[in-house]
């Protein structure tokens, strides 16, 4: 198994999924170059019959940011999911007039071809009735998974610290929560509090008996790293007591060669049955200001590259990212 490294340059928050047509789809944050007005302004897709083919596949823009108002700035971390027979994209966006007013939004494809068919806006993600907290503050990085016939969304929201919350949805209306969320994880350990106190970028990996939620922590520079929480698949996932959190990072800069700040990942099984992690990380040359588009503010530096690693499993079936 040999994948290009970087897999796709300048594509942070990479997300790869396999569709019902057997093809693989890739999306990611389209980068900003040095400032907020030079990027983060569209949603892109790639399609290939193989994971490897995504690295050179044509990149299509399927949606552009609005000129003003909601969904006009900071278009971040899109994820494409096939839910109840339809394609959806969850993404975060701010406003030209308030660029940090970040909230999650939803697009729906009107056909079965996400590359060529029309996408329509379903608007901002909606909380359940009586829930006046969800999406009331800076919130982003929404992901979806199904387990035992129930459908869940996980996202990051800054209610104090940036923490992860989870709630259920009706798969026929995945732009609405159907219950109040639980707090899944918040920054607790030193490695989650470097530069910023952050848990974000959730990614779900299911094994035969467990649900693992990997997440990214700390600031988005060299300190960026990944942790995990997990629960039994047969447990009540909406009961916080059923989740366990590891006290050490699952993947960090010291685990990699010539890569720094690994995070905001997704998981996919390739055409040969290999379990992969797709993540972004900067090259160490970035910190020597050799990237060509260096910026002191990590968010506006495009040198976060999409990369791929093989996930291994120990004798108990626990995933290992290192």
Where are these regions (language model features)?
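Carbohydrate-active catalytic/glycan-binding domains of CAZyme proteins
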Residues: 1-322
């Amino acid at each position: 198994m040999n994948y290009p490294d970087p897999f796709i340059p300048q594509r942070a928050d990479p997300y790869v999924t396999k569709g019902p047509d057997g093809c693989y789809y890739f999306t990611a944050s389209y980068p900003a170059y040095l400032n907020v007005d030079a990027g983060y302004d569209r949603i892109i897709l790639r399609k290939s019959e193989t994971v490897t083919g995504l690295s050179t596949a044509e990149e299509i823009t399927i949606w552009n940011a609005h000129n003003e108002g909601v969904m006009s700035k900071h278009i971040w971390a899109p994820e494409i999911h096939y839910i109840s027979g339809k394609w959806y994209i969850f993404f975060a966006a701010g406003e030209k007039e308030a660029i940090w007013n970040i909230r999650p939004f939803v697009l729906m494809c009107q056909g079965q071809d996400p590359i060529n068919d029309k996408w329509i806006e379903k608007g901002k993600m909606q909380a359940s009735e009586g829930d006046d907290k969800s999406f009331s503050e800076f919130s982003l990085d929404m992901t979806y998974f199904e387990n035992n016939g129930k459908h869940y969304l996980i996202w990051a929201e800054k209610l104090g610290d940036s923490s992860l919350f989870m709630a259920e949805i009706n798969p026929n209306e995945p732009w609405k929560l159907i219950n109040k969320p639980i707090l899944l994880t918040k920054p607790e350990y030193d490695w989650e509090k470097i530069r910023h106190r952050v848990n974000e970028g959730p990614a779900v990996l299911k094994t035969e008996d467990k649900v693992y939620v990997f997440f990214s922590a700390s600031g988005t520079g060299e300190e960026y790293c990944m942790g995990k929480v997990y629960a039994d698949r047969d447990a009540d996932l909406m009961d916080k007591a059923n989740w366990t959190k590891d006290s050490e990072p699952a993947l960090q800069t010291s685990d990699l060669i010539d890569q720094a700040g690994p995070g905001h990942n997704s998981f996919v099984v390739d055409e040969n049955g290999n379990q992969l992690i797709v993540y972004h990380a900067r090259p160490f040359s970035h910190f020597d200001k050799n990237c060509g588009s260096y910026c002191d503010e990590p968010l506006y530096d495009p040198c976060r590259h999409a990369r791929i690693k093989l996930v291994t499993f120990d004798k108990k079936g626990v995933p290992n990212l290192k």
